[in-house]
Amino acid sequence: MKVENHNLAVASLKTQRISAFKARLVAVLLKGKKVSDALAILSHTKKKASPIFTKLINSAVANAINNHGFEHSNLIIKAAIVNEGPTLKRFRPRAKGAASQILKRTSHFKVILASQNGGESQNQEYQETEKNLVSKSPENTQSGALSQQSQAEQPQNDPENGVDSQLSAKTNSITTAKKTDLADNNTKNDATNTVLAQEKEVK
């Protein structure tokens, strides 16, 4: 007997000598039924899996009532699960030295009971667990880390932009100074040329 939370009770039985296909024909009839209705259905179902499910339901009901104080009338079957177990392989001798294979299949049974009164709290717990799983998912953690890195890089980029603007201002001032020097040199050359021309005319 396993108890997952305050509103669910799980009873399991393993390695039963029945195929999962045949057992699931009975499991389909039990899902969503009240415990009393499920036991009535099993009592009128002539299948090999019927006594197995009856045993599981009675065990889960007894533990739920004794451990959690649930009322028998409020219990419903939330799920009846049948999984495949290990398969035993045997051989049957046939004619002319041949042999045919025999598969003895087994199954694992699980019945989950829920309380009708605790449905709202159960849904709240389920939603909270979903939120926690989503918040702890690797995609969200990576996105959060990237956002933190981008926020950390933004203030570092601002001083770099300031340095770049200062360098561009210095280069502009240097180019303007060079242009003014060239203009002064040109004016000086023009003045010397005019003086030389006047001297030649005088001679």
From Swiss-Prot:
Signal peptide span: none
Ranges annotated as biased composition (Polar residues) = 116-127, 134-177
Record protein name field: Large ribosomal subunit protein uL22
User: Which residues fall in a compositionally biased region of kind Low complexity?
Assistant: 183-194
Listed transmembrane segments: none
The species is Mesomycoplasma hyopneumoniae (strain J / ATCC 25934 / NCTC 10110) (Mycoplasma hyopneumoniae)
Say which family it is in.
Belongs to the universal ribosomal protein uL22 family.
Note whether RNA-binding occurs among the keywords.
Answer: yes
Q: Which Gene Ontology molecular-function terms are recorded? A: rRNA binding; structural constituent of ribosome
One GO-annotated biological process of the protein: translation
Q: Which SUPFAM superfamilies match?
A: Ribosomal protein L22 (SSF54843)
Disordered, as annotated region: 116-203
Q: How does the record describe its quaternary structure?
A: Part of the 50S ribosomal subunit.
Q: What does this protein do?
A: This protein binds specifically to 23S rRNA; its binding is stimulated by other ribosomal proteins, e.g. L4, L17, and L20. It is important during the early stages of 50S assembly. It makes multiple contacts with different domains of the 23S rRNA in the assembled 50S subunit and ribosome. The globular domain of the protein is located near the polypeptide exit tunnel on the outside of the subunit, while an extended beta-hairpin is found that lines the wall of the exit tunnel in the center of the 70S ribosome.
Report the Gene3D superfamilies cross-referenced here: Ribosomal protein L22/L17
Q: Which UniProt keywords apply?
A: Ribonucleoprotein, Ribosomal protein, RNA-binding, rRNA-binding
| Example of a GO cellular component annotation carried by this entry | cytosolic large ribosomal subunit
